[in-house]
Amino acid sequence: MAKAADVYFQVDPWKVIEQGFDPAYARVSESIFSLGNESIGVRGCFDEGGHVDSLRGAYTNGIYDMEKLSRSYKGIIDKTHFMIPSAEWLMTTISVDGETLDLGQSQFSDFTRELNLRAGTLTRRFLWTTKSGKQIRLTFLRFLDMVQRERAYQRITLEALNFTGSVTVTSGVSFNVVHEGRQKCFWQETRIDATPDCLMAQSCTTLSNQEEFCGAWLTLPGESTTFAEGKTVTATADVLLAPGQAVQIDKRVVVLFNGQQGDDLWQSGQDAMAQSKAVSLDEAQAAQRAYWDAYWHTSDICIEPKDESMAEAVAAEQQGIRFCSFQLAQTYNGGSMRHNIGAKGLTGEAYNGHAFWDTESCCLPFYLFTNPEAAKSLLLFRYNTLPMALERAKMLDCKGACYPIATLNGDEACPLWQHASLQLQPSTAVSYGIWHYVHLTDDKAFLYRYGAEMLLQIARFQATRVGFSEKIGKYGFFGVMGPDEFHMMVNNNAYTNYMGMRALRYAADVLDAMRADAPETYAALCEKVQLASDEPAQWRHIADNMYIPETPDHLFEQHDGFFELPHTDINSIPVSDFPLYDHWAYDRIYRTDMIKQPDVLMFLYLYNSSFDTETKRINYDFYQPRTIHESSLSPAIHSILAAELDKMDEAVSFFGYATRLDLDNYNRNTREGLHITSIAMAWANIVYGFAGLRSDDTMLRFAPRLPERWKRLTFSVMYRGRVIAISMDADKTVFQLKQGDKLAVQVYGETVELTDEPISVQRQ
């Protein structure tokens, strides 16, 4: 593997710690120290700003704006949308004797920053020595309320060490925020109001006409003055400091947008402010700790080292998987069917806040086994945006539903035609997600009310996008781009053909079952979508005659002609060339057999039980050395398959990469935001990789394989109202139901009945 860790943060099982401040890592740290609660998010930028390289960003889930594009050809989108920064509520200025605190220019020492995964808080401490020799110890605390998700909190603590005197503090709320990528503020006229202890502002986006309200209660010691102009409202006070006396300044924030409230957002904001006033920061922090205590009680993954010599390496893995779990819990909990999971969550502007097909293929398993209702909400987002998918298919001269490669609101937002028009995997990923959810939950009500309609419209799209080759007498997809985005406009991409085959067949199967089980619902659906009687049979015919490029020994060819491409030794690529999109000519990446991310291996992972071990082995051995992992989703897929094939050294190596991808900046782009969807794959790396869970068969299957340097691995999963606790060591795996009725599973191919009594299965 050509990439290497760039280690900066200290290792701790429950914290991420930055000891000392290196300006070169400023943006990386901002991403790592991001906070969120599904509704709002904020990067770990300095409250006081300053001359430090920074992407200041507070974001609200569902807030975006739009811009028109020049369109040359039919099928290419003529407008796009993108997440924009929301109201700046951390806004703080601190001055002493005319000198303003600025860590890019000020003298400071004893700097430490700490993300507490148990408490859900970010704390920063340092000692400021002014030009006049005065010393002030400062502590900045912030957290986003995981229960009342429109609320955020900031506390600044100041303590003079060697003087008695005043410090001028300004705190504010501002919509005068600039989208860095477009160098533009997308907020229009702003309504503002201020009293000494309350600041309020409301604004509207330029084209999407979305409104946001941001208000803050302030506890500024001393007499304060307010200032309101343009898009900014502030309060300023002279705060008296003395040695041994710590002074706290609290800010309690409310953020709402009109997608959450009625027509009168200003009144809704005032009502929410009145409710938040009754809750102190300390009370909110206690509730925050209780929330995270409950989360970790059911969702923690605990890794113990085999011995002291392994302790350091395992500690890094433990920190990595907890960091991943923490960020997933911050990003999405199923609170709204209006939202999906952006590739960067609410941690940065990269990818414009868009959700991709990663949601169903990579994120969904985490929620299926930890929060099934959230998994359902993710699929309902796709149902609610089905009308946009129908329109997109029409743009592409097809029938049915073509789900977008990139979106916030359901419309295709990717301006690159080679991705928006050639990548068909979003639609088949939705089909797969529906199948996986129903397979694990047996939620037929969802399937017949929502899923079936999506499935048949996806099948319609596949049936009109597919082509028939007279030469080979088979169907296939032509002019496509598979998951490996280093090869475009190819024919018969194996992933695209295989997933299309499964989607077509599943849609026909569901309609058959629905006609028998729920004839009235079936009839209503047929009437709604004007389903022709011969359509399902045609889908089966295409599926039965789909071309899957494959050698006699079951090595799948990624696409027509792939085996003839020139070879690239990926280990010869210098680390300084990454990310390749930033350093290589765009067309250069398409010329060889170098793969961005798993393509063939991806469908072997998704439908794992459909392939024998030898098929997986021959394909892994061929494609793994050709994969450069420029997609953050890639390492975990390889680790899971390597563990299954008993290549444990490779599995452990890829696991370290997957869990610490952002913490150790493997792809050299953590500065842009966290790789949220790949973080979900780090969880899968544990559960599907080392525990060997397979969830695509008739019952849950486990084949535990513990890494050599681990003494024990413990975690829990939810399944059909049950909580299954699993504890693995080198010799055995212990299963126990903590909740729910007895359950039959397979372990190493043998059926085992789980009950509330521990049952031990020896390692094989």
Residue ranges and their predicted role:
Residues 25-53, 57-59, 362, 409-410, ...:
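C-terminal capping/lid segments that line or modulate ligand- or cofactor-binding pockets
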